[in-house]
Amino acid sequence: MGKKDKNVSVEEEVDEAEIEKLAAENANKPAPQLTKEDLDAMDDAEPGTSRLALIGKMIKKVSIGTDISNISMPGSFILAKSTLSYFSDNFSSFFGELLKANKIDNELERMLQVQRYLFTTLKETEDTTRKPLNPILGETWQANIHVKDGDGNDVTDNYFFAEQISHHPPISSSTVYNKKEGVNCTFCLPVRSQFMGTYVKISFEGESHITFEKYDEKFTFVAPPMAIRIFRSFSEYVGKGILKSDKNDYLIKSTYTSKPLFGGVYNGFESKVYKGKEKLYKIKGTWSGDMKITNLKTNETTPFFTRPTESAKVVFPDDGNTLPTDSSVVWKGVFDASKKDDVKGMSQEKVKVEEEQRKLAHHRKNADEWKPVHFNKIDGRWQLVNLKD
């Protein structure tokens, strides 16, 4: 990342076991809601007032472990981007890496290529001091994805589609796919945002799937948690990741490591490749840069992967084909205010959307249960109903 740690004095080495214990005790505790006066005061803060100082005042009211998904935020702390778009962006930016796996007949080599793709789905947070918008129930996000194949040719029949299928708990179902190739990656998990004292922990609670129709194979993967280091101005993945196939006994276990306060590297990880209980390979490096693989039988180390720099071209629907539930429509008022640097306007437009959603939720209590429009649950998995050719 090339950044230097900032404000390290506020984030000292702590007893992680004690933090996790407190987090478990407060996991279901609602986040305190700031009053309108509190929010306005933060937006009206004197020019030059440290954003971190304002955050420090705000989090004094929050207990460790509190779910902060729905915490009130002043306009100056709103990132004008729907969370719904993150999953699609992350999994489509380098979708070409997954299409490469569809041309690999060797089972182990195909799994290694899938793991390369999964490394590309890891991304750093744009702004650790701003919170993206929580998607409303039924909100959607879609686009056409243009990638390069192994020969440098354009492949344009790739798409992503996302829908917010649940509000309590917040669940987004996102699919990136190429129907012609029979390649599909679906990410559909409850996401928990917890305040952990000096950072925010984003957990993806469950498994996601990648399918290759050509090989009649389904991969299951578990994404590592993310730690947003508020006072050090960066984010990182810390924890475990797993990749396995339903066709064989190959398994990849990854451990993502935290950047120490002093020294160390950003975005470090180590993965081990197994066949059954036998360890075959070790992959090590930084997921944002270079990675090497070591054959544990011969102890030979060779380059494994370097993260690509050129991402996919994203083509959004034109105005005539944009759904009324699209994020660009739902949050248009917030986005417009953001372009004008009108932080109070952002707050006001956000409140308008949220108040309308509360009214709709009240009406739904007396009606049938809300059902997703674009995804159906088939064999226990949420799947996109209509795939584009």
UniProtKB/Swiss-Prot annotation:
Keywords: Coiled coil, Cytoplasm
Coiled-coil ranges (or none): 1-31, 340-371
Domain of life: Eukaryota
Location relative to the cell: Cytoplasm
GO biological process: culmination involved in sorocarp development
Keyword Cytoplasm part of the UniProt annotation: yes
Gene3D superfamilies recorded: 1.10.287.2720, 2.40.160.120, 3.30.70.3490
One annotated Gene Ontology cellular component of this protein: membrane
Region (Disordered): 1-43
GO MF entries: sterol binding
Oligomer and partners: Interacts with dstC.
Family: Belongs to the OSBP family.
Function: May play a role in the regulation of the slug-fruiting body switch.
Listed name of the protein: Oxysterol-binding protein 1
UniProt organism field: Dictyostelium discoideum (Social amoeba)
